[in-house]
A protein has these predicted regions:
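Extracytoplasmic metal-acquisition and chelation regions
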Residues: 2-305
């Protein structure tokens, strides 16, 4: 008799424990859902601050953006990422890389993050590394502001479908700001079309060629970019073009350190050829649009000399 009573006592007790467990689990699950919702933000990592600026503009208040190359004196080619940078890439929801052999460290980190949405500018522009005449400086593409912000809106919307309209609106707002840059590009194009230019490096070529410039002695520029000395033939061609008065301006990357590049600029100055600076990295405390407009305005003025 006592065994039966014990069984009757234990059965309700077990049911109570199970019921309480279900209640506590349900409450915990609701709490976890609430916490995850409150932290439902997008984390973005961009290899270059120019791309990071656009990523932040489109993202708005829906997350955070970290740009790795974020100082003008940082060399993307020689950059060695730290362990902290590796962690940032691992935690990222969206990764923006230049590609094209420019920031292989960023592409490698992106491959290791199996869940992140990725944007590779080289793929966006159907660029193949090693292609003759190819140029991996995609931030100088004249349609970059439209192409990248639209792509960012797509990636963000895949992560936050409810915010799709918000992201698209932010992209359009940035493109609206960039209209003054597009207007200036068109203005420069009328003066630049068909003009012969020299460059110490092909950094600015994506813009110049799109606006109709006739780039000369390109072997000189490519050699400097690769860290090599231009050949004596390249140097002679540089000097002959200048002596014959065929060059409207010389585009100089002030970050280039080659001796022959400096001599080429000095030779142009001695023959009263205008020098226009075009950097590889964005100056500090300057927006991408302002930076691009400053360089184009300098070119526009040089073409009027």
């Amino acid at each position: 008799m006592s065994n039966k009573q014990t069984k009757f006592i234990w059965v309700p007790a077990i049911l109570v424990v199970i019921l309480l467990g279900m209640i506590f689990y349900s409450a915990w699950q609701r709490r976890e859902t609430k916490v995850s919702t409150s932290k439902n933000k997008i984390t973005v990592v961009a290899s270059l601050d120019s791309y990071g600026e656009m990523a932040e503009a489109v993202l708005g208040k829906q997350g955070t953006v970290t740009s790795i190359i974020n100082k003008p004196n940082m060399d993307p080619h020689e950059y060695e990422p730290t362990a902290n940078v590796a962690k940032q890439y691992q935690k990222a929801d969206v990764i923006v890389s230049n590609g094209g052999g420019f920031d292989n460290w960023s592409l490698n980190f992106a491959k290791q993050n199996k869940t992140a949405k990725t944007i590779n500018l080289a793929r966006l522009y159907n660029y193949k590394d090693g292609t003759s005449g190819g140029n991996e400086h995609f931030w100088y593409k004249t349609d970059l502001t439209t192409r990248l912000t639209n792509q960012l809106a797509v990636k963000y919307s895949q992560l936050m479908p409810a915010k799709k309209t918000y992201f698209e609106k932010n992209a359009k707002n940035y493109q609206k700001k960039a209209e003054k840059l597009v207007d200036l590009q068109n203005q420069v194009k009328t003066r630049l079309n068909g003009k012969k230019l020299l460059a110490t490096e092909p950094v600015f070529d994506n813009t110049l060629l799109a606006l109709g410039a006739d780039m000369q002695d390109q072997q000189f520029a490519r050699a400097v970019e690769e860290g090599d000395d231009p050949t004596p033939s390249d140097v002679r061609e540089w000097q002959e073009l200048i002596k014959r008065g065929q060059i409207a301006a010389v585009i100089d990357n002030p970050q280039a350190t080659g001796k022959l590049a400096k001599q080429g600029v000095d030779y142009a100055k001695a023959h009263d050829v205008p020098i226009v600076e075009a950097r590889e990295t964005k100056p500090a405390q300057t927006s991408y649009i302002t930076w691009q407009m400053k360089q184009l305005n300098a070119l526009n003025e040089a073409l009027q000399e």
